[in-house]
């Protein structure tokens, strides 16, 4: 049956998906190579491509599956932004969308009927006008209040296969590519090299 959060967001037609391998799919820290884990072998490149799902919901009307990704935030501004589709527009959140699309692609490769509509279930830690998180009577306990929101996202996974070919080509290349100017890893490496020289 639908979880109360699904009902509260007008998604009572969705229910948690049940599958014997779901726990393995959710275990990204134990990424396994067996077909029971959340991965697929891309036969054209022989790359094992996978990760760890947060959740999968099933549409009771169509039978289609919806990938669900859990996200958390704690907005520090006095006027926090609403958690809606526009909340996903920050440049760095493009990675969230790519992850959703990759997981949709993997589920399809595993033979499931997957909707292009996925959901980001956001929790937003509340701090404005809050006395604090630590329980005064039991200081070994802390509590935090969260607002919740479900943000729909229409994914497009048509880029994934080309990306896998590009990854394979890069792995076989004897020379690494140059870092992009805004690459955080490149900045880190440059600063590390500079610090080591001094």
PLM region spans:
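Metal-dependent nuclease catalytic cores that hydrolyze phosphodiester bonds in DNA/RNA
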Residues: 1-61, 192-198
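Residue-level signal for well-ordered alpha-helical scaffold segments within enzymatic catalytic domains
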Residues: 8, 55, 66, 102-109, ...
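Short, charged/polar micro-motifs that form catalytic or ligand-binding hotspots
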Residues: 42, 46, 86-97, 173-176
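Short, mixed charged/polar active-site loops
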Residues: 48-50, 63-65, 141-148
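Conserved catalytic cores of phosphodiester-cleaving nucleases, focusing on short active-site segments
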Residues: 51-86, 103
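Short histidine-centered catalytic/ligand-binding loop motif
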Residues: 76-94, 148-153
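Metal-dependent nuclease catalytic cores in nucleic-acid-processing enzymes
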Residues: 88-118
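Metal-dependent nuclease catalytic regions and adjoining charged, substrate-binding loops involved
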Residues: 106-198
């Amino acid at each position: 049956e639908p979880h109360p959060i699904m009902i509260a967001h007008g998604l009572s037609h969705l229910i948690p998906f049940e599958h014997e391998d779901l726990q393995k799919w959710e275990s990204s820290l134990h990424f396994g190579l067996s077909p029971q884990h959340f991965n697929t072998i891309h036969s054209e490149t022989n790359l094992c491509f996978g990760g760890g799902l947060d959740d999968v919901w099933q549409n009771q009307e169509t039978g289609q599956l919806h990938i669900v990704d859990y996200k958390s935030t704690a907005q520090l501004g006095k006027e926090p932004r609403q958690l809606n589709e526009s909340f996903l527009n920050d440049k760095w959140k493009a990675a969230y969308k790519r992850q959703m699309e990759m997981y949709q692609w993997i589920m399809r490769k595993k033979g499931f009927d997957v909707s292009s509509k996925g959901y980001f279930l956001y929790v937003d830690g509340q701090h404005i006008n809050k006395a604090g998180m630590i329980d005064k009577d039991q200081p070994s306990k802390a509590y935090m209040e969260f607002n919740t929101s479900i943000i729909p996202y229409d994914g497009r996974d048509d880029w994934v296969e080309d990306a896998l070919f590009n990854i394979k080509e890069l792995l076989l290349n004897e020379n690494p590519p140059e870092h992009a100017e805004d690459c955080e890893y490149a900045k880190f490496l440059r600063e590390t090299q500079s610090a080591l020289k001094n």
